[in-house]
């Protein structure tokens, strides 16, 4: 029997089971029936999880008197927590290459068929985190055609599947049974080429009708597949609905159950945003504050954090004018690991409030208290959002020289607009216990000639968003 199950990404039992399995492995207790793997396409998340679990279990093994170095712990952790590319590459190594007639087939000369496993991997269960981020057919086909990002991996021309379809196909190679658990969140697509959860149902309908689908009624809401999932499910042969597969209470902002609804209303200009916020404030559940001064935001974060509670600054990847606020956006998985895991004595820690991370690095992770810096990439204009990206190009000046011209250009691509707004949805829901939103005041100074000192940070590019958030009832610090 083959099952495809949908669940909310904040299900704690998944993480706890993973931790328990890793602990038993690292401390020498072998479980031969262990048949699950946690998969994610989120490199920073996998890097942080692997490092955190390796550190934790190395300490626990040491406390039991067992010798275990961190590299061994990391290797054993990676048996259960994998970047999706690694799992995918293992299966790609087994297929006939090049693909002919748009049919992916196992090459018997490259793989050995086993009684239970068939040509599949050893795991019965694949837990795919943030399944809505699986790649479209075009993105994965382009990626495999050029042999990975840098052209140094296996090249597979004319690849005919989306990432979701290929993962189902991979588990379908087993001779006995398999389950794919898709952890999904609504309105979370933030990257070009993310297919959304509808792609999984399309794959089932097209080629895997013998699979059974289990999901929650809430998955047909507007924020999932833009409300079109129900239409796709009408063509699915075996569908079972269960409300047990939906987490109705947010565990990230655990002090305020209605906080995620407030953020959704804020971003969609829903008139009930003010009343939801008023109820949160009345219950004194979750502080949501507003400021135009980054130093006030830093001071508030330091005052709120107790003990080992973690603070940090968040910013979108489309933001471009944060340097005047003394903010550095870090890059690379290693730096992200240090940002999340080091304590307050380490300058690389998020708690120093000098380095920031973007929605790409923080997706799937969270802080106790956070500051979201709202730049001029997404702006409120009355009752709608406008989208902008900073453009730097050279232009001919009166002095007969080429000079750089820097300005915000409108982003007109509808798909990119969706990603840019969803980036703020991700950032605004990363704090467990409280959030401050910093909207810069901009730079109103003029040069001696009467021109703006910084035309990219004029007050008017920030003021509309500030006035909108303040009108909802956000208190200013």
PLM feature spans:
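Short secondary-structure boundary/capping segments
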Residues: 52-60, 140-147, 193-204, 227-233, ...
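Conserved RecA-like ASCE ATPase "motif II neighborhood" in helicase/translocase motors
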Residues: 56, 68-171, 354-358
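C-terminal accessory regions
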Residues: 176-179, 352-476
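Conserved helicase/translocase motor-coupling segment
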Residues: 190-196, 205, 216-383, 414
């Amino acid at each position: 029997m083959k099952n495809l199950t949908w669940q909310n990404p904040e299900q704690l039992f998944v993480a706890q089971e993973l931790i328990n399995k890793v602990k038993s492995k690292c401390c020498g207790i072998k479980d031969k029936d262990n048949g699950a793997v946690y998969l994610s396409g989120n490199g920073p998340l996998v890097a942080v999880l692997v490092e955190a679990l390796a550190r934790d279990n190395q300490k626990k093994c040491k406390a039991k008197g067992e010798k275990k170095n961190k590299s061994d712990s990391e290797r054993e952790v990676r048996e259960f927590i994998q970047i999706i590319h690694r799992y995918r590459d293992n299966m790609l190594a087994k297929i006939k290459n090049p693909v002919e007639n748009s049919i992916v087939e196992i090459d018997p000369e490259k793989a050995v068929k086993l009684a239970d496993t068939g040509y599949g991997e050893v795991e019965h269960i694949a837990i795919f985190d943030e399944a809505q981020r699986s790649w479209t057919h075009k993105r994965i086909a382009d990626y495999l055609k050029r042999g990975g990002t840098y052209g140094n991996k296996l090249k597979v021309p004319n690849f005919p599947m989306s990432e979701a379809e290929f993962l189902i196909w991979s588990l379908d190679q087993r001779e006995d049974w398999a389950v794919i658990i898709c952890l999904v969140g609504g309105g979370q697509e933030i990257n070009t080429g993310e297919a959304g959860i509808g792609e999984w149902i399309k794959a089932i309908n097209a080629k895997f009708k013998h699979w059974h689908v289990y999901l929650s009624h809430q998955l047909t809401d507007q924020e999932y597949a833009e409300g079109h999932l129900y239409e796709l499910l009408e063509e699915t042969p075996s569908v079972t609905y269960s409300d047990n597969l939906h987490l109705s209470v947010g565990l990230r902002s655990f002090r305020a159950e209605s906080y995620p609804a407030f953020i959704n209303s804020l971003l969609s200009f829903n008139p009930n945003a003010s009343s939801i916020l008023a109820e949160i404030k009345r219950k004194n559940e979750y502080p949501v504050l507003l400021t135009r001064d980054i130093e006030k935001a830093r001071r508030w974060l330091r005052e709120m954090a107790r003990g080992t509670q973690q603070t940090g600054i968040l910013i979108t990847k489309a933001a471009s004018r944060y340097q005047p606020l003394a903010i550095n956006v870090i890059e690379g998985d290693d730096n992200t690991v240090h940002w999340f895991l080091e304590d307050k004595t380490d300058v690389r820690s998020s708690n120093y409030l000098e380095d920031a991370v973007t929605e790409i690095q923080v997706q799937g992770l969270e802080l106790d208290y956070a500051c979201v810096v709202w730049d001029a990439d997404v702006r409120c204009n009355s009752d709608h959002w406008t989208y902008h990206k900073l453009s730097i190009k050279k232009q001919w000046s009166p002095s007969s020289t080429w000079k750089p011209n820097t300005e915000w250009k409108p982003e007109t691509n509808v798909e990119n607009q969706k990603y840019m707004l969803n980036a703020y949805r991700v950032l605004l829901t990363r704090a467990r216990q409280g959030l401050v939103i910093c909207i810069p005041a901009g730079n109103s100074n003029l040069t001696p000639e009467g021109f703006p000192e910084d035309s990219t940070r004029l007050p008017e590019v920030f003021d509309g968003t500030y006035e909108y958030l303040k009108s909802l009832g956000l208190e200013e610090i």
